[in-house]
Amino acid sequence: MDVGELLSYQPNRGTKRPRDDEEEELKMRRRQAGTRERGRYREEEMTVVEEADDDKKRLLQIIDREGEEEEEEEEPLDESSVKKMILTFEKRSYKNQELRIKFPDNPEKFMESELDLNDIIQEMHVVATMPDLYHLLVELNAVQSLLGLLGHDNTDVSIAVVDLLQELTDIDTLHESEEGAEVLTDALVDGQVVALLVQDLERLDESVKEEADGVHNTLAIVENMAEFRPEMCTEAAQQGLLQWLLKRLKAKMPFDANKLYCSEVLAILLQDNDENRELLGELDGIDVLLQQLSVFKRHNPSTAEEQEMMENLFDSLCSCLMLSSNRERFLKGEGLQLMNLMLREKKISRSSALKVLDHAMIGPEGTDNCHKFVDILGLRTIFPLFMKSPRKIKKVGTTEKEHEEHVCSILASLLRNLRGQQRTRLLNKFTENDSEKVDRLMELHFKYLDAVQVADKKIEGEKHDMVRRGEIIDNDIEDEFYLRRLDAGLFVLQHICYIMAEICNANVPQIRQRVHQILNMRGSSIKIVRHIIKEYAENIGDGRSPEFRESEQKRILALLENF
């Protein structure tokens, strides 16, 4: 290595961390040349530094002058220049590989070629500004060559490749050229990019800042590709990413940006994906999530970022509980006990714990969890939350409506699934203290009935205007209106009316009389409640088998006979 090489050095255009001065630039060059061999060849490096220091002023003048000339003479990026760049990359990659094979124990022999390889990788960042030319990366086999370098012996090279791939797959860039994005994504998926990235992740040391950045950029590649092509999430999880994410989450390391990013990517992989949910369960992922969340049962997150990670983990857990097999794992892992404890501790985690319990107990698959919840004295926890919505919930981003929605859904699930002694214990709660819980139920009923009636009036006005303009109200528009009504409060109201029907069919005269008494006092009618429950029954069972849908509708409508 000589002064000529230093003169020919081009700044790292792709790096996200600009260097402050020439001295820092030289240090970075030495690190990229061979971090792992630094100890053995420190003497040679010192010689280079001395040469640089001797000619520092002259070097800076020449570099500044050449930089100005380059700006003036720089050619616009086109197919020809990209092809030339890719050819240079292939040559330098091959040369470095050849020298490493020829001189495996003499880094000074291949150090220069590694510098050259790193330089051209940095120059290739400019291709990310022209996604229309991505097809050249595929046609000239550059993508496969880049993927091959993910396993390079020098992690500095693999990190440089990861940084480049992250920029090439930036979601905003991908949307600029759908065709170019498709070609690049196909090539990356065909080359099993995630499997190679995971292998690279396994050897990175996050105590080294550059390698920690490499981990972050790797996760960004996965996020970018998952957003552009959601179906690749299943393959990504099966190629070892899900297992690595779980391992990284439970690693005994201080909270950092990478742990937050891991929680985000995990939530993405599990979204609407039963295969990944099942795989997580098989990898003991439910236990990992519960262990990580247990930290927040008595302590609030210390930062906004840590709170975001906590919410991501809760979202992942809720997503997994959509699968019945994971509800069994949740039960065995004492997830109910943890969530119940969080409800009692009144920390920030309480709102999310309530959502988890809702997911764990809903539907016939939640029967075992419902019974266990009563056994661990969960009724003592849930009914105070039913009687009064906490004042502090707005501070943690949860609305009063969301809180009441989850509580009412849990009570509806308990009434649906409980049998025997546990059901009796639940019904007795509605007779305590002069039926105060029935009074609260009716208070919520009128609150949400009013909200839904306001929404219905607005929707009817919109329908009238559409008819007047000659527009057709098709099924899609009707579905949209129904979703708006659900969001306005119909979803909560349906659960409230279902609870009313269940407790009035419980052969407890005191409860039934109180419900009818309050309805009459408010000038309301059983007909309104029946209409709401019928509408609820008609729309139940979405995504389930026709047999379940039919039997559930019959069961719900049967409740109206004795209401």
UniProtKB/Swiss-Prot annotation:
N-acetylmethionine is found on M1
Using the record's annotations, give every residue carrying the modification Phosphoserine. S389, S545
* Cellular localisation: Nucleus
Q: Where is the composition biased (Basic and acidic residues)?
A: 34-45
Pfam families hit by this protein: CTNNBL (PF08216)
What is the protein's quaternary organization?
Component of the PRP19-CDC5L splicing complex composed of a core complex comprising a homotetramer of PRPF19, CDC5L, PLRG1 and BCAS2, and at least three less stably associated proteins CTNNBL1, CWC15 and HSPA8. Interacts directly with CWC15 and CDC5L in the complex. Interacts with AICDA; the interaction is important for the antibody diversification activity of AICDA. Interacts with PRPF31 (via its NLS). Interacts (via its N-terminal NLS) with KPNA1 and KPNA2.
Protein name from the UniProt record: Beta-catenin-like protein 1
The source organism is Bos taurus
